[in-house]
Amino acid sequence: MTLALQYKRILLKVSGEALMGGQSFGIDVSVADRIAADIAEVRAIGVEVAIVIGGGNIFRGVAVASHGGDRVTGDHMGMLATAINSLALRTSLTKLGVETVVLSAIAMPQICESFSQRKAIGYMNQGRVVIFAGGTGNPFFTTDSAATLRAAEIGADVLLKGTQVDGIYSADPKTDPTAKRFDRLTHVEILQRGLSVMDTTAVTLARENNVPIIVYSIHEKSGLAKVLNGTGRFTIVSE
């Protein structure tokens, strides 16, 4: 059995920084289009796809708190940034003919629909790509935690995190040439080793709900399809 068949329904977590490309801020449309093409490729082979996008290319809530501001307000601003990114990726997917809907944890009816579990599953059963905006809708939670929560809610077979590198390393491979890449880890090992691939809340939630995690490079063309076919470079996290 191929991974594409094993993983019928996936949730893809994309960082906001991934959308910047070579820019220092904002959205590089060509990057959004390439990520959309990768998603369309796996959708074409029957994989049901949901997506959570971060907002770090536009705003990070912790930035407000670090300058003495209110963290809750900062996180609300970050949630709005995820909505901007979600609309951008929906635009890129729509250009490819992929039916896509944005569901937000924060009500904004003129812009997108509000999230509900039943609605999300219904759209996925219809073959649409679903993008979840607004994080969890609550402050103090990362979009990694939101991705894990949504993966559990929709019954995703796996949570895929597209990052800047091709898996989980013992240290930052960009600064430490001795960093070792892991092929496989457990959720507990990530927590025990203090590996920074996801925050503790996200990893714990994934472990408690039996959600496996695959970490791969978002920058490789057709990288998502390669991972699902078992031919790419990645780290898989499962018990």
Curated annotation (Swiss-Prot):
GO BP, one annotated term: UDP biosynthetic process
Activity regulation remarks: Inhibited by UTP.
Its EC number(s): 2.7.4.22
Q: Which pathway does the record list?
A: Pyrimidine metabolism; CTP biosynthesis via de novo pathway; UDP from UMP (UMPK route): step 1/1
Q: Which keywords does the record carry?
A: ATP-binding, Cytoplasm, Kinase, Nucleotide-binding, Pyrimidine biosynthesis, Transferase
Q: Where in the cell is it found?
A: Cytoplasm
Specify the enzyme's EC class, one word. Answer: transferase
The entry assigns this protein to a family as follows:
Belongs to the UMP kinase family.
According to UniProt, the name of this protein is Uridylate kinase
